[in-house]
Amino acid sequence: LKSKREQLSSPAPNTVPWEALVGNAIGGDGRDITTPEDVDKDTIALIMYTSGTTGKPKGAMLSHGNLFSNLMQGKAWVPGLGDKPERMLAALPFFHAYGLTMNVTLAQFIGGELVILPKPDMSLIMQLMKKHTPTWVPGVPTLYERIVKAAEDQEIPIKGVRAAFSGASTLPSDTVKKWESYTGGLLVEGYGL
């Protein structure tokens, strides 16, 4: 059992440890990091685990090509995204493909700033909306409905939001109208069941 624990807690083969990645990147542009192998679009970048809603949970292997394609599709929904400095409200969990793509990888790709929420708490969201004025808000319909209601109730202007991207469930047309009227920005539906 001890040897199994040591094996599971030791560095994974053919990987760059997080500490080395961050440590090298702080002092330079990250180009000095040696990767353990050649990386191309078909190389597995990460494994995300499913919730098991239609069966047992399983690891979905995502390649570098998958991540890049998702990133480019997300960016294409909002023409001009990244042409100006962007500040993104990161209310989605990063352990989900939607949050990882529309917040983490997209922010890195366009050089955007992430305003990260430790938990989905409306009072915190509104404090951050007021303090940081995000320009990009990926989320779910309920998030947009609650932000507009809280902004109306607390008289917090949210006019700086240029674009929002909705997923996870169907986006009601009333939500789009209220959001776009209140923010002056665009709200598009990407994928909703």
Where in this protein do the model-derived segments appear?
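Gly/Ser/Thr-rich phosphate-binding loop
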Residues: 134-139, 148-193
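Conserved AMP-binding
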Residues: 91-96, 169
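Conserved AMP-binding/adenylation subdomain of ANL enzymes
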Residues: 68-87, 95-135, 146, 150-151
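Alpha-helix capping/helix-boundary segments
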Residues: 121, 142-144, 171
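ANL superfamily adenylate-forming
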Residues: 1-41
